[in-house]
Structure formats: C-alpha cells, structure tokens
C-alpha cells in the first residue's frame, strides 16, 4: 500500500541480476505500527519488497505481516511506467484479516482492490510531487450508501535534506465519500494525512551493496482527530 514508510525515504538498490537492462532490488522494513495514508492498518509488522525494473517499466511486490495475532496480512502488486517526471501505475491491493478473504476470488466479493495512479514531480529545482490514486474495483470500495465509491486520494509532498537527514513533508486528502476504504466516517472532502518523515541510511562495509536505515514518521489525521509517531528500520540489498 502504496504507499511505504521507508520507501518514501530510501530507494531500493539494484542487485547483481542485470541482463539487457533488467535489474532486481529488494529489502524489508520493520515498523512499530503500519499506517497507510494516515489510517492505521496494523501493529508492529515486517514489510518485505521485491522490484524488477526493465527500462521505464517496473513491477513491485510488497507485503506486510502483523506480528500480533490480529491476522492482518497484505500483498500488493504494482506495475508502473515512468515517463519523464510522470509515473503511471496500476496496483492490485490485497489485504485481509479474515479466513474467508481468499486470494483467488475476483467476483463481487473479492478482497482485492484495483487502483490506478499518477504522480508528477514538478521539476528538479522544485521537487514537489503531486499524486492522485483511484480505486476501480473491489468489494470494499463502497460509500455510506453502499454504492461504488471510486475511492480516491490526492497527495502533495516535498522531499528535502537537513544536514545528512533525508526528510519528506506532505498532506493527503480524500475528495469524496469513501467510508469503507479509509474508515474516516460518513463525509465528503477531508484531510486525512499530514506527515513529516525523517530517515538516514548507511552502507554496510564488506556486504556488497547492502544498506541499513532508520526512519521516523510523524502522522496527523485531522479527519479522525488522531496523531501517531511511527519508527522503523530499513534493510536494502
């Protein structure tokens, strides 16, 4: 989900498998709690990722498994294409806390959500990123009336550096009622994600490109009158 606490700060390094422009990268994060777009999804979690890149195309598998007994499990697949400052994406978002949420169910009861997105980096001198995501399919994509919601999310964010610390600040909004997706109540436009991220990575000497990082995310959700402080470790290969 899209989304990724450490990935917002630390890029995934490419590893040895390179052939005709194809490369692979991966890693895992350990987080004190898992928040997606300002909304709590689970407690402490392990979040692995694997990316294959070929030219301007990339395919990423990302997951999250809760350490507690809540049963929360997530598996996302994202296909992305970068066209200059614009990145277009299609993602299959699958998360479940119930035994009857079967992965290979794609009918009206499907626990999957199919989301399309677009992100635009304004310029190198002004590295603001404007992003829009909309869910097109999924049983849970409903508004308070039970109608298809086409749940959408808009975010404006900007990375910057303070001495040797990588920072990122931004705000995320929901433009219309998406009660079943974001659990922020029966309302239309609202701000649900105001965040400030900070992190730093180090190379592991003698480990052939391995990196370790530490990050913190301060998250406000005005729609829920909530605030959270998340910390974690990032491992990249």
Briefly describe each language-model feature range.
Residues 14-67:
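Short glycine/proline- and aromatic-enriched beta-strand/turn motifs that initiate or cap beta-hairpins
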Residues 22, 42-46, 71-75, 110-114, ...:
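Residues that define the transmembrane beta-barrel architecture of outer-membrane proteins
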Residues 31-37, 57, 62-70, 93-102, ...:
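Sequence/structural signature of outer-membrane beta-barrel proteins
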């Amino acid at each position: 989900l899209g989304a990724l606490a450490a990935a917002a700060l630390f890029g995934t390094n490419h590893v040895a498998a390179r052939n005709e422009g194809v490369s692979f990268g991966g890693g895992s994060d350990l987080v004190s709690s898992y928040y997606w777009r300002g909304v709590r999804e689970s407690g402490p979690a392990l979040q692995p990722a694997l990316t294959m890149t070929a030219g301007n195309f990339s395919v990423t598998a990302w997951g999250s498994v809760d350490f507690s007994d809540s049963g929360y499990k997530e598996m996302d697949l994202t296909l992305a294409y970068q066209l200059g400052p614009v990145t277009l994406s299609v993602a299959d978002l699958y998360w479940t806390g119930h035994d009857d949420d079967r992965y290979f169910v794609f009918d009206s009861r499907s626990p999957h959500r199919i989301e399309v997105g677009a992100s635009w980096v304004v310029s190198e001198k002004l590295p603001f990123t404007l992003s829009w995501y909309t869910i097109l399919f999924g049983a849970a994509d409903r508004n308070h009336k039970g109608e298809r919601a086409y749940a959408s999310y808009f975010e404006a964010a900007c990375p910057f550096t303070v001495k040797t610390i990588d920072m990122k600040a931004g705000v995320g909004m929901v433009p219309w009622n998406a009660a079943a997706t974001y659990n922020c109540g029966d309302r239309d436009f609202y701000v649900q994600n105001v965040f400030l991220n900070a992190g730093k990575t180090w190379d592991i000497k003698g480990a052939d490109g391995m990196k370790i990082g530490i990050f913190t995310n301060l998250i406000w959700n005005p729609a829920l009158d909530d605030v959270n402080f998340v910390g974690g470790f990032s491992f990249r290969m």
